[in-house]
Amino acid sequence: MANVIVIGAQWGDEGKGKITDLLSRSADVVVRSQGGVNAGHTVVVQGQTFKLHLIPSGILYPDTECIIGSGTVIDPSVLLEEMEQLHALNVSTENLFISQTAHITMPYHRLIDRASEERRGKYKLGTTGRGIGPTYADKSERTGIRVVDLMNGDDLQEKIEWTINYKNAILEKLYNLSPLDPKQVIDEYRGYAEQLRSYVIDSSLKIYEAIQQKKNILFEGAQGTLLDLDHGTYPYVTSSNPIAGGACVGAGIGPTVIDRVIGVAKAYTTRVGEGPFPTELNGEIGELLCDRGAEFGTTTGRRRRCGWFDAVIGRYAVRINGIDCLAITKLDVLDELDEIEVCVAYELDGQICDHFPSDANQFARCQPIYRTLPGWKQSTTNCRSLEDLPKQALDYLKFLAEVMEVSIAIVSLGASRDQTIIVEDPIHGPKRALLDENGVPVSKADTQE
């Protein structure tokens, strides 16, 4: 039995969907613990592409139970659309479960999200406009509507009427927008309730029972560490906690049941939206990374900003999450480069800085200090073991493991499941593996007398 968290070690879009899909074949349960439709993950199976926002990647395995947890925010229209798309591809959703305590994204959340972003002007955050922030704001303000409310028809009408009257005042007076019709919204969401009712459960209890039965549970993170509300590049962050600790809170479990944390990072770095990005490349190499990596958001379609691998934020992610091993994705995107840079530290106001500064103004002033490594100038997409990799590619991976101070368990060389190298058992491998002088993972137990 193993309970494993998969989280993003950068700014999201690291390829968690593929890694979770790979690991789901060994999982009995997959849990999505936070975020909403602002997160997208893509899985490619036998040439067929699945783009999901709310439903866990494990849905492609019919014997794997998939839970949308309490810490998520759910847009019912998007969820039902995803379910219909899966049905059209002959994928069952009978193994899907929805937490009764997850919060619901309402029409006024989307309207306020977009209007608020437009009103910010030069201070815009780069929100997806899907209503995620306002939904979480209502959750904190204790005025939100939860799945359990949606299922309670008697109270739903009164609650929606009161909330819409309150939100209409904001829409009209602050944003000069037309008010919403409470009856229309009530009818719409009652329809969603009937379609989703059979999927709704006490998710924390179900997860607890799976733990008691010693099942393998995979907790699937959305977004990435640097987008965490408390520990990311605030204010250019999401409205939830996509770190390992947030997975426990969002799933409704204690941290002591977690056996392993797997961090996912690209072989370079990307970011969507606004905010500082020390290793960003605006020239030809940045364009090459974007084009070869197909760096366009699953949710918004926006072009992602691309840059060199940043080991400073990588080490920060390892520390914040207690990462035991890494999955490095999109190594193949670097195949055509003569040289590859890795940021190992920053220069901040004339001083060497080897840690991530929490002050956004300081972070914006950080200049990357690079280590240059040779490229390999040949395709890696058909490599299926470390021995198949060009020496320079293997040296690059060893260097990343060294500067990140954690071992690499998985290397991804393309979107398909089979374009993967398993270096060590990512589920049952050693806790926080160390490296010997040859870059080979060894457990802490092996290093103790």
Swiss-Prot record:
Binding-site list for Mg(2+): 13, 40
Origin: domain of life: Bacteria
Binding partners and assembly: Homodimer.
The species this protein was found in: Gloeothece citriformis (strain PCC 7424)
Protein name (Swiss-Prot/TrEMBL): Adenylosuccinate synthetase
GO biological process entries: 'de novo' AMP biosynthetic process; IMP metabolic process
Biological role: Plays an important role in the de novo pathway of purine nucleotide biosynthesis. Catalyzes the first committed step in the biosynthesis of AMP from IMP.
Enzyme Commission number(s): 6.3.4.4
Positions of GTP binding: 12-18, 40-42, 304, 330-332, 412-414
SMART domains from the UniProt entry: Adenylsucc_synt (SM00788)
Catalytic activity, reaction form: IMP + L-aspartate + GTP = N(6)-(1,2-dicarboxyethyl)-AMP + GDP + phosphate + 2 H(+)
